[in-house]
Amino acid sequence: MKQELHHTLLGCGFRYTPAKQMPKGILLDTKSRRKGYYVKEYSTKGGVFVIALVLWNDPHIQLPFAYILQQPEQYKGRLLPHINFGFCLCYVTQMEADWNSNDLKSTYQDVDEQIQLTLDNSVASVESGTSNDVELEGEFSAYWQSEEELYLLAKPSRKAQLKAHLVEAELSSGSIRREYVAACSEQSEELVKWLNQRKFDESSLQEVSITTHCISVKPNRLAGVNWPPSCLREVLSWLKLVDYSAHARTVTLLMAKRTKRHILLFDVEGQDELAVYLELNLDVIGKRYFGRNAARKRNINNEAALLGGKFVSANFKRLGVTRADRDTLLSRNQSRPDVGNLSQKRIALIGCGTIGGYLAELLLRSGAGCGENYFHLYDNDSFKPHNFARHSLTAHNFGLAKSIALANSLKEAVHIAQSIKGIDRQFPIQADVLSKYDIVIDATGRPPVSKRLAAVARTLIADIRPVLIHAFNDGNGRASKVLVDDGRCCYGCMMADPAVYRNNIDLRFEGIDLAKEKHISCGSTYTPYDAAVSHITAALAQEAVLNTLEHTLPWNYSEHMLDGSRSKKPRTLKRFSGCNICDE
């Protein structure tokens, strides 16, 4: 294998260079006697790049790392697409890429061609200098080389009054973990939860907050600029080059008042945010530059020159920005973000057993209870050791009410979970209670509850009637089933169809003695089966709940069979004539 790869790379124009013969001062191992690298010169319109390939232990499934040993002088210190830290060439998205891992020759010939193509595209991007550079699309911030992290708990905008705090925590190893956190003033509760969940000390909030400025940047170019900036002067120079309006706003904000500590949050159009933390030396700037009369004409260039002075910025750090606002946290769980998320719905979950426990966690990650509207969990049972094998709760919750323990678990999961409540009693199936919710989920698996919910819901007018979702395991764990009752078909309609059910039993299970499989004792009934069925039922129920955000429901019944038989396709059931609930 090594000989085949060696000859393939030599055939592509690489030369094998022992580690000890590599240039000094590079970030590769140049001392090992056994190591070596494959080096090649690539010609582009901008000059010659010298690339060294670093091979991994298994070259079949890991593509080589491309290290830039040398690049044209005019590009040094400038932002080139796909080149990070000045030496790392990102020629492929390896984790998403696919290649024939059993054909080394073709794979490494493709690597050679891809390196050439990447370098050509990078040089062309610098020379064109456009603002909508496809080579930098969505990855401009990757070249920022941040020194510390800033987490945003709110969407950045010019109107948002963000305040930031530096928080610290001592790890068990004795080292200190620190980060900057920015939030709006009305997010004080979320901010405290963020600190607690991430094991930071709340006392950090007693310190004076850091003034945070959000500045929109619409650059006229991205590639080719000197990058990354290492001081405030270089930041201002960059802004002046690419967006003079953002440059003027930055200078104006910094000179507006006597504030030592600032965070500049740059919202670069079409890219992720960048941030800078800096401390201004107010004595150097001088009192005469603060609180200027608005009627007096400013000289932005003079003020920028002052701010860029050698002794003005006492501390400067590039911050990596990570958004942790509600929309960002929920974004990957939305196939269609335009329909919104469950934070806008009032939801009741009846039953916090196996299905309800898994479903509650899924709904949280779709936004339930993460806004002004509430997410209520109902169950009057407690969590016991024999529930553990099929439940999401842990041994910490033994003896506690399922609903309250589950609600606490959800609230501890993320800082935006602010409207979740566990209620340690049965759900009161009354019209006035049902009308308080948009969605009521029946995860009890009890037919009497399902029938009563369907009947009482029909005493409400359509405008205030909630959507009922029945999620249950059937056939003693052989099937996962979900029915959505939006007024067109109820639980009784489903059970009354003689083509599917007889005596409330699915015809597919008539030949099975279901009662014999159950373990029944006074006050306790259970059926042993794999928890996978409840996972599937919860997943189907989550899909059903998310479908209520759409203008029309794609289906109102879905199932999955786990006994090897064929599952019916999701479908729309209609009202059944003779249903003793709908026809009364």
UniProtKB/Swiss-Prot annotation:
Its EC number is 2.3.2.-. Residues 339-584 are annotated as: Adenylation plus E1-like domain. Keywords: Antiviral defense, Isopeptide bond, Transferase. Disruption phenotype: Essential for CBASS function; when the operon missing this gene is introduced in E.coli it no longer protects against phages T2, T4, T5 or T6. Disulfide bonds: none annotated. Residues 138-338 are annotated as: Linker domain. GO terms for biological process: cyclic threonylcarbamoyladenosine biosynthetic process; defense response to virus. The active site is at residues 90, 522. The keyword Metal-binding does not apply. The keyword Transferase applies. Interacts with CD-NTase DncV in the presence and absence of phage T2. A Cap2 dimer is bound on either side by a DncV monomer. In the C-terminal section; belongs to the HesA/MoeB/ThiF family. CD-NTase priming component of a CBASS antiviral system. CBASS (cyclic oligonucleotide-based antiphage signaling system) provides immunity against bacteriophages. The CD-NTase protein (DncV) synthesizes cyclic nucleotides in response to infection; these serve as specific second messenger signals. The signals activate a diverse range of effectors, leading to bacterial cell death and thus abortive phage infection. A type II-A(GA) CBASS system. Primes DncV; acts as a protein transferase, conjugating DncV, the CD-NTase, to unidentified target(s) in the cell via an E1-E2 ubiquitin transferase-like mechanism. During the conjugation reaction DncV is probably transiently attached to AMP. Protein conjugation requires ATP. Has an N-terminal E2-like domain, a linker and a C-terminal adenylation plus E1-like domain, dimerizes via the E1-like domain. This is ATP-dependent ubiquitin transferase-like protein Cap2. The gene is cap2.
